[in-house]
Curated annotation (Swiss-Prot):
This is Maximins 3/H3 type 3. GO terms for biological process: defense response to bacterium; defense response to fungus; killing of cells of another organism. It is found in: Secreted. The modification Isoleucine amide is found at residue 143. Coiled coil: none annotated. Residues 1-18 form the signal peptide. Belongs to the bombinin family. InterPro entries: Bombinin. Residues 19-43, 74-123 form a propeptide. Keywords: Amidation, Amphibian defense peptide, Antibiotic, Antimicrobial, Cleavage on pair of basic residues, Cytolysis, Fungicide, Hemolysis, Secreted, Signal. Maximin-3 shows antibacterial activity against both Gram-positive and Gram-negative bacteria. It also shows antimicrobial activity against the fungus C.albicans, but not against A.flavus nor P.uticale. It has little hemolytic activity. It possess a significant cytotoxicity against tumor cell lines. It possess a significant anti-HIV activity. It shows high spermicidal activity. Maximin-H3 shows antibacterial activity against both Gram-positive and Gram-negative bacteria. It also shows antimicrobial activity against the fungus C.albicans. Shows strong hemolytic activity. GO terms for cellular component: extracellular region.
Amino acid sequence: MNFKYIVAVSFLIASAYARSVQNDEQSLSQRDVLEEESLREIRGIGGKILSGLKTALKGAAKELASTYLHRKRTAEEHEVMKRLEAVMRDLDSLDYPEEASERETRGFNQDEIANLFTKKEKRILGPVLGLVGNALGGLIKKIG
């Protein structure tokens, strides 16, 4: 009789444990589903915010371009445009480094070559940063 009692109690404990494991799995899967749904919502909101920012930046760029296109340029703006054209030429030469390096580096040693490219980077970055700063300053003045 004791053996039957032990087997019955063991069976009840095993079935209760199996039910608790099954309930845990269901609650975990429900939590996973809820987490996935919330992540999808967050990604959707983030995507909408990014697309709004892209649209705003495109609009600001168009406004800035139209401002410079439809009015007379000052001497300073003309100088900025010349620098921008020079930067674009330098960037084009960076797209084809073999040709540019062959033309510019004939007869130089490695240190002179490194100095040449460092100067070129400074020549490119300086006007670009200046243009970006001027554009942002103009936008801030318009907004303010």
